[in-house]
A protein has these predicted regions:
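Alpha-helical structural modules in large enzymes and assemblies
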Residues: 1-211
Length: 211
């Protein structure tokens, strides 16, 4: 019998990641459990749940969400910690956005984007077709038994989710992201480094150009 799934929170949607993990971990067990309940108890609810677990499309959505939310949860947890380095948090947010963009847009275009352009970058102009996006090995493996038309629709919906996620992250990036990253040159660790001390010339130039 499958274990109880974590209760979903209406306000903390990121907490749903734990529920998604548990659902995937016991997917086959849950499918078998509700199939047996359908046959032995003639339970309508059990039948509905069995059909949901038997549908490969639902499994694909869960696999996509699990992989997509994993990195987001890590960064979100860092933001909630006490005494976190604000510059490090900003770098984590930038890297998170870049990781999602790497899924959506061609690599050659991603390499051309400067950090200070990330907030205003219109990714919808460069997003690849869902059929050309790689959603990961587990997703690809699970998609084998899904027909082409349905798979195309699933990929497009996953792509739309990622686009909106990127847009929301963009809204949370600071406008002076380039200067903030250069300020990290002045951290105690960098300032007292015996080798490879950072060149602060670019930082000084940034303040001069912003006068």
């Amino acid at each position: 019998m499958p274990t109880k799934i974590d209760k979903l929170s209406g306000t903390r949607w990121l907490a749903r990641y734990n529920a998604i993990n548990k659902i995937i971990e016991q997917w086959d067990v849950s499918k078998l459990h509700f199939k047996m309940a359908t046959e032995s108890e003639r339970c309508y609810t059990a039948q509905q749940l069995y059909e949901m677990f038997a549908d490969k499309r639902n499994y694909l959505y869960m696999v996509f969400l699990q992989k997509t939310l994993q990195e987001l949860i890590i960064v979100n947890t860092a933001f909630q910690s006490d005494g976190a380095n604000s510059l490090k948090l900003m770098e984590d947010l930038v890297n998170l956005l870049k990781n999602y963009l790497a899924i959506l847009i061609p690599p050659i275009r991603l390499q051309q984007i400067l950090n200070q352009e990330l907030m205003s970058f219109c990714l919808s102009d460069y997003v690849m077709s869902g059929d050309f996006i790689n959603f990961g090995y587990t997703f690809n493996e699970a998609s084998v038994s899904v027909n082409k038309a349905e798979l195309t629709n699933i990929k497009e919906r996953c792509k739309t989710f990622l686009i909106e996620l990127c847009v929301q992250i963009q809204c949370r990036l600071p406008t002076n992201i380039d200067i903030l990253q250069k300020i990290n040159f002045l951290s105690p660790a960098n300032a007292t480094a015996q080798v490879r001390r950072p060149d602060v010339t670019s930082l000084a130039s940034s303040f001069r150009n912003n006068k």
